[in-house]
Amino acid sequence: MDALEKSLCDFTGSTPLDQRFRSLFTIKGLAATSDQHMQRAISIISQAFSDDSALLKHELAYVLGQLEDARALPTLKKILQDLSQDAMVRHEAAEAMGAISDPSVLPILEQYRSDSDVSVRETCELAISKISFDNSEEGQALKQSKAQAKLAEEQSGLGGVESAFKPIDPAPAMTPAASKEAARSQADGVRYDASHVPLFQSTLLDTNLSLFERYRAMFALRNVAHGGGDGAIQAVLALARGLQDGSALFRHEICFVFGELCHPASIPSMLHVLNDTKEHEMVRHEAAEALGGIVEEGEHAANDSANDYTRVLDTLNKWAHDMDAPRVVRESCIVALDELAYNNDPTQFHRIETSTPVAA
């Protein structure tokens, strides 16, 4: 991992940001291969928080959460407590604690539930709710069911909706029938389709409900969209309606979901968000990164999406070079352009994990 550490922790500016992102996610992949690599990965990623890029540090916190290892908690706690850090970074640290879901972090999350920044407050609220859910009877049943389903998928070589989304969500997807029985069967066979969109949309847009319940509806709509067909477009449009919500955190998560889905129907919404200079930079950054994954020219050209590709490319280039734009927006566009280029021409560069020998 020495070469990866050198790349990720290059604070001189000589290593391009997009290359450092590739190094980060290569480290994330290697972490899963052994406990030794996991410890080394956590150590390297923790060192990288010395960088001055809020975008990179936000991504570092995200990855630490996705590693789902309690040894990352000291670093995440330190970041959340550091009021000099950008709120976007602190929010991601709190969300990462929720992903790891260790009840020992509940006191610090409760403390920062009254933080001066609303995105940090809301994230702490979500993380507390997720940890509570994970340790409830329903959450434990869901965890067991998913573990059994994962084992069955590994044995059969098949996978369903849940296996398509490996990231740990900040809230479990709502089921068509919110019950313990539904939770137990979710990983085994709950089918999300167009008939569920009205219920999920209603929950998503109901500001009288908790943020956690609305997030659950958000990820349920994602699962509907992943199923394809008419339900996919309906679900994407339902999610897009959530972009009118008053919470920047909520809007940014919808953009993240669009990035997971890579559905062409979300392109107009993401372009609108990125071009809206009055929108919160956290939301614009997520829209930019979502656009980087949505369009693959060769795949979609036959579906009359060439114009979409051109618009996305032009818009990302515009904001990547606009020195008056917030730094996190510019850098997100740079990373998105790198992803877009790779998706369309894998021969233009070799990913660092295949071109650079990795020494543990």
UniProtKB/Swiss-Prot annotation:
Cofactor: Fe(2+)
Cystine connections: none
One GO term describing the cellular component: cytoplasm
Record's keyword annotation contains Cytoplasm: yes
Cofactor note text: Binds 2 Fe(2+) ions per subunit.
Chain positions recorded as Fe cation 2 binding sites: 252-253, 285-286
Coiled coil: none
Catalysis: reaction(s): [eIF5A protein]-deoxyhypusine + AH2 + O2 = [eIF5A protein]-hypusine + A + H2O
Subcellular location(s) of the protein: Cytoplasm; Nucleus
UniProt-recorded Gene Ontology molecular function terms: deoxyhypusine monooxygenase activity; metal ion binding
Binding residue positions for Fe cation 1: 58-59, 91-92
HEAT-like PBS-type-type repeats, residues: 56-82, 89-115, 213-245
Documented EC number(s): 1.14.99.29
Family: Belongs to the deoxyhypusine hydroxylase family.
Job of this protein: Catalyzes the hydroxylation of the N(6)-(4-aminobutyl)-L-lysine intermediate to form hypusine, an essential post-translational modification only found in mature eIF-5A factor.
Protein name, per record: Deoxyhypusine hydroxylase
Source organism: Mycosarcoma maydis (Corn smut fungus)
